[in-house]
Amino acid sequence: MAQKAPMTVTFVTGNQNKLKEVRAILGEEHADKFTLEARKVDLPELQGEPEDIAKEKVMLAARQIDGPTLVEDTSLCYNALQGLPGPYVKWFLDKLGHEGLNKMLAGYDDKSAYAQCVFAYVDGPNGEPKVFVGTTDGKIVPARGPTDFGWDPVFQPDGFEETYAEMDKAVKNGISHRYRALDKFREFILAEAAGR
C-alpha cells in the first residue's frame, strides 16, 4: 500500500521571522504527516476579541486558498490597562516604538502583562474554524535585546531574567505563547492527518 502524501496546510503570513519560528516550533519530525507552506494573503484588519478576529481571518483566507488554512493573531495585554493594547499591539508598536510601549505603563505600578497567541485553522472555505490559544505571563520592561521581531524586547516572561528578544531561540520556542498554541495545533493536525 502506497504511503499517503503529507497533508499541506497553508499558513497565512508575510512575516519571515514568524514563519521561521513557527516551523522551528512545529519541527520536521512530522513532515511525513503534514507540511506547512506560507502564503501572503491580503486580509482586512479586523477589530474585536482575539479569538473572533482569528476565526474571521481564517475564513476570509480559506476562501482565497481553497484548502487547509492556518492564521495567527498575537496580542500583548497589559493588566493595568485591562488588556490593551491586545490584538492592536502591532499598530501601537508601529506608532510608538518599543520605548512608547514601555511608557504606556509609566503611571502604573502594575507592569504585569501576558502574551497571547491565537491560531485558527479550517480545512477549507466551508469548514468550521478551530482555535488554539497559548498564553505566557510576564511583565513589561525597558527594551532589551535585538529589535527585529516585534515587541519581543519589552516582554520578559515570568521566571526568566531575559526578554524574549534576549533569549536563545530554542528557549523562547519552548516556553512562548506561540509554542503553547502550536503545541495544541500540532496535536490536532496530526490526528486530522491520520484520519485522512
Swiss-Prot record:
Location (main, coarse): cytoplasm
GO biological process: deoxyribonucleoside triphosphate catabolic process; nucleotide metabolic process
Tagged with keyword Transport: no
Classification via InterPro entries: ITPase (IPR027502), ITPase-like_fam (IPR029001), RdgB/HAM1 (IPR002637)
An example Gene Ontology CC term for this record: cytoplasm
EC category name: hydrolase
Residue sites binding Mg(2+) per the record: E45
UniProt-annotated binding residues for ITP: 13-18, 57, 73-74, 90, 149-152, 172, 177-178
Cofactor(s) demanded: Mg(2+); Mn(2+)
Compartment(s) where it occurs, according to its Swiss-Prot or TrEMBL record: Cytoplasm
Keywords: Cytoplasm, Hydrolase, Magnesium, Manganese, Metal-binding, Nucleotide metabolism, Nucleotide-binding
Family: Belongs to the HAM1 NTPase family.
Function: Pyrophosphatase that hydrolyzes non-canonical purine nucleotides such as inosine triphosphate (ITP), deoxyinosine triphosphate (dITP) or xanthosine 5'-triphosphate (XTP) to their respective monophosphate derivatives. The enzyme does not distinguish between the deoxy- and ribose forms. Probably excludes non-canonical purines from RNA and DNA precursor pools, thus preventing their incorporation into RNA and DNA and avoiding chromosomal lesions.
HAMAP family referenced in this protein's UniProt entry, alphabetically: HAM1_NTPase
Designated name of the protein: Inosine triphosphate pyrophosphatase
Organism: Micromonas commoda (strain RCC299 / NOUM17 / CCMP2709) (Picoplanktonic green alga)
